[in-house]
Design a protein with these regions (language model features):
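Membrane-interfacial helix-loop connectors
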Residues: 75-77, 83-93, 101-111, 119-123, ...
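Entry/N-cap segments of selected transmembrane alpha helices
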Residues: 30-49, 127-136, 168-176, 254-269
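Membrane-water interface at loop-to-transmembrane-helix junctions
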Residues: 2-13, 32-42, 155-184
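C-terminal transmembrane helix pair
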Residues: 112-116, 130, 224-279
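Hydrophobic core segments of alpha-helical transmembrane domains in multi-pass membrane transport
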Residues: 12-23, 43-51, 136-145, 173-182, ...
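Membrane-interface helix termini and inter-helical loops of multi-pass transporters
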Residues: 25-36, 118-127, 156-157, 188-190
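Hydrophobic alpha-helical transmembrane segments in multi-pass integral membrane proteins
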Residues: 16-28, 112-120, 178-186, 213-220, ...
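C-terminal ends of transmembrane helices
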Residues: 1, 52-61, 82-92, 145-157, ...
Length: 279
């Protein structure tokens, strides 16, 4: 870790230790969902997951293999990983095969990550929410394994990643989480549960972590049906795959897009099937 990395981590830890005890632990606002202490705990959770991946990246990323590069990328940010590898393919088209595998593995880790997030913030609903999400995650695992079997490229150094403990990134996530949980509660109160699917469609382009945490918390508080909760999380995850495929095309190459889209297409089809057919 560089001196700047250490400073960023220490700054975030110190600020969190100072801020958390003084933040009010009560909800306020029109829909009583904006709890300052809870919002900052969500920031700490997401930064902690990303930081674990970032520290591992600093320790092993220089010579990371394909699987490790994908796992670390998914822990830090699967979207940022997609952007980084798409840009690398733009400079070196021959890296398309390697980049596609890493992007799909990172997205698979992101699929598992939402289950962990639900377990962390709303364990009471995990038994009802996890099965369809686990089923979809296993499909993503299958796609990752399939791509690994057909790709013999060795991994190389991972692109430089942003430290998730940077205060700016943490504050942005906190703001996005607060906005999404407020929008979700407002949509539910004014328009009913069906409106949450529209929130999921938009959130998938912005931040899957935020919609996952906010929906899980609302479901645990019995303000959102548990079935609606996992459907919203899955829809946001599927939209995020569409977004990453678009990134692969616009920032990378047609070859990268085709490779990524072949895996994501199966995953999206499977996800839609789960949405429609899950009992």
């Amino acid at each position: 870790l560089s001196e700047r990395d250490v400073q960023a981590v220490m700054r975030f830890v110190i600020i969190s230790l100072i801020i958390l005890p003084v933040l009010p632990d009560e909800a306020f606002g029109p829909h009583l969902v904006l709890n300052p202490r809870e919002i900052w705990w969500m920031v700490v959770l997401i930064v902690g997951i990303g930081l674990a991946g970032y520290v591992s990246y600093k320790l092993f990323g220089g010579g990371a293999g394909v699987v490790l590069a994908g796992i670390l990328g998914g822990l830090i940010s699967s979207t940022a990983t997609t952007v980084a590898y798409a840009r690398r393919v733009k400079e070196n088209p021959e890296a398309a095969s390697l980049a596609a595998v890493i992007i799909v593995i990172a997205s698979t880790v992101a699929a598992a990550r939402v289950i962990v997030e639900v377990a962390a913030v709303a364990p009471s609903i995990l038994g009802a929410v996890a099965p369809p999400l686990v089923a979809w995650c296993l499909l993503m695992v299958l796609m990752s394994i399939t791509m690994l079997m057909f790709d013999k490229t060795q991994g190389d150094a991972m692109p430089e990643q942003e430290n998730p403990a940077e205060l700016k990134s943490a504050l942005i996530f906190g703001a996005v989480y607060a906005l999404i949980i407020f929008a979700t509660a407002a949509a539910k109160d004014y328009f009913g549960g069906q409106a949450l699917y529209g929130i999921a469609l938009v959130s998938g382009f912005v931040d899957v972590d935020a919609i996952t945490l906010s929906t899980a918390r609302l479901a645990a508080a019995q303000r959102v049906e548990v079935t609606t909760a996992w459907q919203v999380i899955l829809i946001a995850s599927l939209v995020n795959l569409v977004f990453k495929a678009g990134v692969a095309l616009t920032l990378g190459s047609a070859q990268l897009f085709l490779r990524v889209a072949s895996a994501f297409g199966v995953a999206i089809a499977g996800g839609v099937t789960i949405l429609v057919a899950w009992p």
